[in-house]
């Protein structure tokens, strides 16, 4: 009998005892009272003793599809097992998922009999907007009560460090409480809502205050990752992760929820508009609201991108004065960056700015993660890009030739540069086909932008831009980009952010974006 079978066995045993009592040998229970002390079963020690009470309500993971939500058990269930040693591999049995809450399931079903199918879908979309606000508010409050406050009280982090990581999160809660209150006020007793357009037009402009929070995310994520090297911080966060309230989401998932919610508003509003009849007065207001939120998202994207670019420029270390380049200083946008390896197995961190490619090595300087230049910066306009076929390069730099199949490596591309006596060639390897294609697209588009600005768009191929598979796959524009920003919520620890190449590129998704384990290689 294994440990997990014990509770069931104990229950059955007690039940059998209760059934056998009437069939006993006739000894009355008042004749021989038991003097044995009954010990209450011990409960498993939990993090609840360290964390202030938090309302255990459903948590919604906004970075996934709109219709998918997740929740956790709202009641603590006493554990009848004896206390056991805490394990990092332990999983909480109290955590469970449930389907999204629908409008038609929440309110009286009879109302469906007098509404058209299109109107029901409209009510569902409006309810999704309202429910999302409620979940967001609960998540933000949870982040403060379950993470910020305990770490401050236990001196796990300093107040200054926590302010840097959590940013202006507190100021966002009242904004969303205001919208939720207005949406509830206009909801009829039967649960239906007639108009939401005027409310949204009046409320959406306040989201401009998101710029400071989103612009701080790059620095916040970097500091949080650095603090995880502290055993106390890592231990606290791991215990939280394994506790029911976290829904198995780590701290950064909670801190990234506001950004994820921001980029979803255009999708939510378009869904409401799609099911709104043309003769409904709400249609004009919804169209105006969509224009407002798209403008706000675009502006915040730009500011966030500039903030990210400044952050990494400040952390570049130059071995010699000659490595400094005015193209780096003048850059306002970081198109993409991530860890790669060269063909000698050296880990590199590559930055693609607007007009220059910078290859670095990650180093620790004054207890901060910095990036030491590995080679001279390469101007994008003079860069030659080659998409290498799998097996064309092997470790050590040899070209395809006398080596066995098991020596072949995949996902390589090559960047080279020659200007007079100066020349460089780097064979770089991505961790998979997708990341390789992201790098190729990003570099191609960056070069096209630079050459187009110089009136040389027709010289792309003659400049050495070798066309490879997927050349036509460019980053989406306009509304499509806003939708795709929400789709890249992979939980990878990659630092590669390759979804932006211009000022309009979606910088929001890239704050927590993805290039961990990218493996490019270099051949000089």
From Swiss-Prot:
> What is the disulfide pattern of this chain?
none
SMART domains linked to this entry: PH, RhoGEF
Keywords in alphabetical order, please. Cytoplasm, Guanine-nucleotide releasing factor, Phosphoprotein
Q: Where is the composition biased (Basic and acidic residues)?
A: 472-484
Fetch the PROSITE patterns from UniProt.
Answer: DH_1, DH_2, PH_DOMAIN
Say if the entry is tagged with keyword Phosphoprotein: yes
Any idea where the DH domain is?
A: 121-303
Matches recorded under SUPFAM superfamilies:
DBL homology domain (DH-domain), PH domain-like
Pfam families in UniProt: RhoGEF, SOS1_NGEF_PH
- Domain spans labelled PH: 290-448
Question: Which residues fall in a coiled-coil region?
Answer: none
Q: What is its main location?
A: cytoplasm
Query: Could you mention a single GO BP entry for this protein?
Result: intracellular signal transduction
According to the UniProt record, list the residues that bear Phosphoserine: 46, 69
Highest taxon of the source?
Eukaryota
Region spans: Disordered? 461-524
A GO MF label: guanyl-nucleotide exchange factor activity
Tell me where in or outside the cell this protein is found: Cytoplasm
> Assembly and interactions?
Interacts with RHOA and RHOB.
**What is this protein's name?**
Rho guanine nucleotide exchange factor 3
Say which species the protein is native to.
Mus musculus
